[in-house]
UniProtKB/Swiss-Prot annotation:
<keyword id="KW-0540">Nuclease</keyword>
<keyword id="KW-0479">Metal-binding</keyword>
<comment type="similarity">
    <text>Belongs to the CRISPR-associated endoribonuclease Cas2 protein family.</text>
</comment>
<feature type="binding site">
    <location>
        <position position="8"/>
    </location>
    <ligand>
        <name>Mg(2+)</name>
    </ligand>
</feature>
<dbReference type="InterPro" id="IPR021127">
    <property type="entry name" value="CRISPR_associated_Cas2"/>
</dbReference>
<dbReference type="GO" id="GO:0043571">
    <property type="term" value="P:maintenance of CRISPR repeat elements"/>
</dbReference>
<dbReference type="Pfam" id="PF09827">
    <property type="entry name" value="CRISPR_Cas2"/>
</dbReference>
<dbReference type="GO" id="GO:0004521">
    <property type="term" value="F:RNA endonuclease activity"/>
</dbReference>
<dbReference type="GO" id="GO:0051607">
    <property type="term" value="P:defense response to virus"/>
</dbReference>
<keyword id="KW-0378">Hydrolase</keyword>
<comment type="subunit">
    <text>Homodimer, forms a heterotetramer with a Cas1 homodimer.</text>
</comment>
<dbReference type="InterPro" id="IPR019199">
    <property type="entry name" value="Virulence_VapD/CRISPR_Cas2"/>
</dbReference>
<keyword id="KW-0255">Endonuclease</keyword>
<keyword id="KW-0460">Magnesium</keyword>
<keyword id="KW-0051">Antiviral defense</keyword>
<comment type="function">
    <text>CRISPR (clustered regularly interspaced short palindromic repeat), is an adaptive immune system that provides protection against mobile genetic elements (viruses, transposable elements and conjugative plasmids). CRISPR clusters contain sequences complementary to antecedent mobile elements and target invading nucleic acids. CRISPR clusters are transcribed and processed into CRISPR RNA (crRNA). Functions as a ssRNA-specific endoribonuclease. Involved in the integration of spacer DNA into the CRISPR cassette.</text>
</comment>
<dbReference type="GO" id="GO:0046872">
    <property type="term" value="F:metal ion binding"/>
</dbReference>
Length: 101
């Protein structure tokens, strides 16, 4: 299961930029990886753990802008096609069941 966070936040004022930085930092601290600008994804073991993570992110959401979440299965995530560009080869973004470090 993957939890995807997509957001579009205002950056017109210094307060807006501060809110943006805090939200982005909170996502990274929770283990999310950036797959595109303003699109972050995290692996969750179950739908219940993804819902829990969604609740945690809701506590740090900025007061303005748009923040959306999407839960997708591993198969759905792996069926994503790249029309332009290539996939980031990050071990944390791997679909492998076992990762040897």
């Amino acid at each position: 299961m993957r939890l995807m966070i997509m957001f579009d936040l205002p950056v017109a004022t210094s307060k807006d930029r501060r809110n943006y930085r805090r939200f982005r930092r909170a996502l990274i601290d929770e283990g999310f990886l950036m797959i595109q600008y303003s699109v972050y994804v995290r692996v969750c073991k179950t739908k219940k753990s993804a819902a829990y993570m969604e609740q945690r992110i809701a506590t740090v959401k900025p007061p303005t802008g748009i923040v959306q979440t999407l839960m997708v299965t591993e198969a759905q995530y792996q069926s994503m096609h790249f029309m332009v560009g290539t996939e980031k080869q990050d071990i944390r973004n791997s679909a492998d069941r076992t990762v040897m470090i």
